[in-house]
Amino acid sequence: MRCPSCFHNGTRVLDSRPVDEGRSIRRRRECESCLNRFTTFERVEEPPLIVVKKEGTREEFNKEKILRGLIKACEKRPVSLKQLEEVTQNVERELRNLGISEVKSDMIGEIVMEALRDIDDVAYVRFASVYRQFKDLNVFIEELKDILQKERE
C-alpha cells in the first residue's frame, strides 16, 4: 500500500478489524519511510446488478432509489429511517442471492411492496398506488380489500 504522504510503497499493518457487519476490513497502517499513520478499508467488490426497466432500458441497481421511494411512501407515518434502510439492505441482499446479473424492475417493486406490507399498511398502499399505477378508484379499493382480507386470515 502506498503512503498518502510520501508515496513510499512500504507500509505495515498495525491493526485490522471487521466493519460494516463483516463486509469490510478496516486496517490501520504505518509508513515504513515517514512513519505517517493512515487508515484503509478493504471490501469485496460486488458484481454490478443491472435493472431491466419496463420499457426495456437497463441501468445499474441503485439502492438509494429504493430508499427515496420508501421515504416518500412512509412520509408522516410511524416508520423510522433505520427500518427503511434495513428494508433497502434486505431487498438488495435478496436480489443478489438470486445469483443473476439482471433483474426486472417489477420484481424489485414486488419485493419492496411485500416488505412494506409487513411494516405499515398505509405506506404499502401509497407505494403500491404509484408502483402499480392504479388507473381508477376501483382498482385502489380492490387493493384495500385485499389488504383487509389478508389481515383477517
From Swiss-Prot:
Residues 49-139 form the ATP-cone domain. The keyword Transferase does not apply. InterPro entries: ATP-cone_dom (IPR005144), NrdR-like_N (IPR055173), RNR_NrdR-like (IPR003796). A zinc finger (unnamed) spans 3-34. GO terms for molecular function: ATP binding; DNA binding; zinc ion binding. The keyword Nucleotidyltransferase does not apply. Keywords: ATP-binding, DNA-binding, Metal-binding, Nucleotide-binding, Repressor, Transcription, Transcription regulation, Zinc, Zinc-finger. Pfam families: ATP-cone, Zn_ribbon_NrdR. GO terms for biological process: negative regulation of DNA-templated transcription. Belongs to the NrdR family. Negatively regulates transcription of bacterial ribonucleotide reductase nrd genes and operons by binding to NrdR-boxes. This is Transcriptional repressor NrdR. It comes from Bacillus cytotoxicus (strain DSM 22905 / CIP 110041 / 391-98 / NVH 391-98). The gene is nrdR.
